[in-house]
């Protein structure tokens, strides 16, 4: 459990979780926010609120470009606040404009192993528009290769190779954040 005085090391900086779909951003984000005693937001959930429909519907009816624009609008609004934990959509890193917002905080890449992501996705079929192809595993591999250079720009990288409880992962992420803060304290960018 993260102690309140430890959480103050962030100096009000928002934590943005980035990474592939099914890397655990939403589940871990909620746990990390609870331990840091901060509000939690999920950009995918906010996009669905703004659009009044599911992400799958947005993709089907208006296309990925429209979804990405809504995602950028949501991120722009969140970047105006401090002391948040934000789980982002897997593709948020693809737009340079989004990085200008992400740089208002500390970015943490949840670098989940490909086989772990695939196992999680198999338990939740049909909910990922970008994987609605004849070969979803190949599509996932392509997306991972395309996005990895963008994820690598994160302030902190946390490798995740096996299933762990949200509290264990939150501790792992917090330790990685603390190591980064020791090396380079935040300046409320």
Swiss-Prot record:
Example of a GO biological process term: amino acid biosynthetic process
Residues annotated as binding substrate: 44, 68, 90, 147
Signal peptide: none
E.C. designation(s): 2.7.1.71
Keywords: Amino-acid biosynthesis, Aromatic amino acid biosynthesis, ATP-binding, Cytoplasm, Kinase, Magnesium, Metal-binding, Nucleotide-binding, Transferase
Cofactor note: Binds 1 Mg(2+) ion per subunit.
Residues annotated as binding ATP: 22-27, 128
Annotated Mg(2+) binding sites: 26
Reaction catalyzed: shikimate + ATP = 3-phosphoshikimate + ADP + H(+)
Sequence similarity: Belongs to the shikimate kinase family.
HAMAP family found in the cross-reference section: Shikimate_kinase
SUBUNIT field: Monomer.
Stated name of the protein: Shikimate kinase
Gene: aroK
């Amino acid at each position: 459990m993260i102690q309140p005085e430890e959480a103050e090391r962030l100096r009000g900086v928002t934590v943005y979780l980035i990474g592939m779909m099914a890397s655990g951003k939403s589940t871990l984000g909620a746990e990390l926010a609870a331990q840091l005693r901060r509000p939690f937001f999920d950009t995918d959930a906010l996009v669905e609120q703004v659009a009044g429909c599911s992400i799958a519907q947005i993709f089907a009816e208006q296309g990925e470009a429209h979804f990405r624009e809504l995602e950028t609008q949501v991120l722009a609004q969140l970047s105006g606040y401090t002391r948040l934990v934000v789980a982002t959509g897997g593709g948020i890193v693809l737009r340079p404009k989004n990085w200008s917002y992400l740089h208002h905080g500390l970015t943490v890449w949840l670098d989940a192993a490909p086989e772990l992501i695939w196992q999680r996705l198999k338990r939740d079929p049909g909910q990922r528009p970008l994987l609605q192809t004849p070969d979803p595993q190949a599509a996932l591999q392509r997306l991972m290769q395309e996005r990895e250079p963008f994820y690598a720009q994160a302030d902190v990288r946390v490798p995740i190779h096996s299933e762990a409880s949200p509290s264990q992962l939150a501790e792992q992420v917090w330790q990685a954040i603390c190591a980064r803060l020791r090396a380079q304290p935040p300046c409320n960018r």
